[in-house]
Amino acid sequence: MGNPPSAHKDDSGAKWLFAKVGFAQGVKLLARILCSAVIGIDAYIVEVEVDIASGLPAYTTVGLPETAVKESRERVKSAIQNSGYRFPDDRITVNLAPAHIKKDGTGFDLPIAVGLLAATHSLDHNELGRYLILGELSLDGRVKPVAGSLPMALAARQAGYDSIIVPHANAREAAVVDGICVYPAETLSQVLEHFAEGPALKAVETDRETLFRNRPPSLSNFSDVVGQEHAKRALE
C-alpha cells in the first residue's frame, strides 16, 4: 500500500478529513466524503466516514443503513477491483451520519468507494472538500443513475457547496439548480482521476428556459382519477 500521505486537515472549513493516527498494530486511516439522501421530496446532507484499521478483514456499515445500503459492500468491492484498484484487506467501518436517520438507496456506492480509496491513495483533499458525490456503482465500475438528484443538488447549494458529482444520466436534472457546478461521471476511474491527477470531469450546463419551454404539456386532470370524489373536491 506504500506510506500514506502525512496528516492534514483543511483549515478552510471543508467537510473532509484525512488523518493518520498511530495504532497499536499498525496504521489507522480515516476519510470523510459528503453525499446526500432523500426523504420524501426533500434532501439532506450525509457524511460518509470511512475508517480503515489494522485487524482481521471485516466490513461494517453503521448509521441505520437499509438493505440496499448494506448490499453496497459487494458492489463497491467489485467496482474498485474491476477498475484496477486494490480493495483494502483490513477492518473497515463505514459510518453514515447523521446516524439517527434511516439511509436508503444506492446513491451511497460512489462516495463510499471514493472514501475507501481516499484513505489509501493520494487524492486532492482540498478539492474533495468542495464536492458532494453521489451515484450507484455497477460491478465493472460504471456509475449508474440514482433517484432524487434535483433535491440533492438543491441541498448542496443550501449547505453552501458549489460543486456536485452525479451520474451522467442525472446531470441535466441536477443542472437545473442555479449556482452550482454539476460534474457528470460515467465511471469510478474518472472520479478518482479528477481528484488524483487534475480535472478529468467537465461541468455540464443546462439551458433552463429551453428545457422548461420544450417540456411536454400535462394533459392529466382529476377527471382521470377514478373514485376519491371527496379528496378531489377538497383539492379543487
Say what each PLM segment does:
Residues 2-7, 11-236:
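Peripheral, non-AAA+ core regions of ATP-driven protein-machinery
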